[in-house]
Amino acid sequence: MSDAVTKTVAPLRRKANPINGKHTNGVTIDGIFDDHNRQIGPINSQMEDIAQKTDDGGGGEWTSKASFMTWTMHDIIYVARHHWIPCLFAAGVMFFTVVEYTFQMTPASSQPFDLGFVATRYLHSILASSPNLNTVLAALNTILVGMQTTYIGCTWAVEGRPRATIAALFMFTCRGILGYSTQLPRPQEFLGSGVDYPVGNVSFFLFYSGHVAGSMIASLDMKRMQRFRLAMVFDILNVLQSIRLLGTRGHYTIDIAVGVGAGILFDSLAGKYEEMSKRHLRNTRCSLISKDSLVT
């Protein structure tokens, strides 16, 4: 490294909102750079910059203006162009707020309205008029459940990776608690089958779909292990499974939607549990080593 070292202090940038693509409020970069412009010194945090401001002591300009008062038309255009997904969700909030306050609630004497049932009414009529086809699709669906269960179990028993198994345990336990807590009525047009899972056409919890959540957990693990083709097959089968469940009235749309979210959520929680366990194990080993060094 060259002996010639220069210290560069960037000035305080005053831009109201970090989402506008420019510098954030109150970020001062105080670093030391060598001749090749490589940083070799520390970077001050935003909180340190706030503490180092030397105005009138009461906050001054820092608190005199709210963030929105510094927004410009350029900022609004930038957000609309580069952050269109949050803008789309904002429009969705406004739209469904209007919908929620203008629609009448479904009477207690009526069956719940389900948009998925409306979309699959043609499939429902076909399956209702063809019990053999319904039985074949139910058997294929049960095979898919067996495939995902086998895969999730093998990730732990064969490959020694417990994350997917832990996620499935979390997911089915939570599903049992929620399903028992709120026992939704079975749809009147339900088309059962003796080979469907749960086998024997027994009673089952509707909220949420364990079929869909289990397939999501298996698919996420496949993608994590870069088994992308197998994951794509599972995703396609999961979509077909969801359509079949709606067509047979085996689940409401909300059960399937939450099943997708539950698979993602519990896979993430299982990953955090693994990280926490590894961190605890490392800390335990370090404490044991330090104890041994003190004894010796």
UniProtKB/Swiss-Prot annotation:
GO biological process per UniProt: phosphatidylcholine metabolic process
Stored PANTHER family: PHOSPHATIDYLCHOLINE:DIACYLGLYCEROL CHOLINEPHOSPHOTRANSFERASE 1-RELATED (PTHR34674:SF1)
Assigned protein family: Belongs to the phosphatidylcholine:diacylglycerol cholinephosphotransferase family.
Function: Functions as a phosphatidylcholine:diacylglycerol cholinephosphotransferase that catalyzes the transfer of the phosphocholine headgroup from phosphatidylcholine (PC) to diacylglycerol, a major reaction for the transfer of 18:1 into phosphatidylcholine for desaturation and also for the reverse transfer of 18:2 and 18:3 into the triacylglycerols synthesis pathway.
Record keywords: Lipid metabolism, Membrane, Transferase, Transmembrane, Transmembrane helix
Record-annotated membrane-spanning stretches: 83-103, 136-156, 165-182, 198-218, 250-270
Gene Ontology CC annotations of this record: membrane
EC number: 2.7.8.-
Superkingdom to which the source organism belongs: Eukaryota
Localisation per UniProt entry: Membrane
Keyword Glycoprotein: no
Protein name (record): Phosphatidylcholine:diacylglycerol cholinephosphotransferase 2
InterPro entries per record: AtPDCT1_2_TM_dom, PDCT1/2-like
Pfam families xref list: AtPDCT1_2
Topology in membrane: Multi-pass membrane protein
Active-site residues, Swiss-Prot/TrEMBL: 211, 251, 255
Principal EC category: transferase
Record-level Gene Ontology MF annotations: diacylglycerol cholinephosphotransferase activity
UniProt keyword Lipid metabolism, yes or no: yes
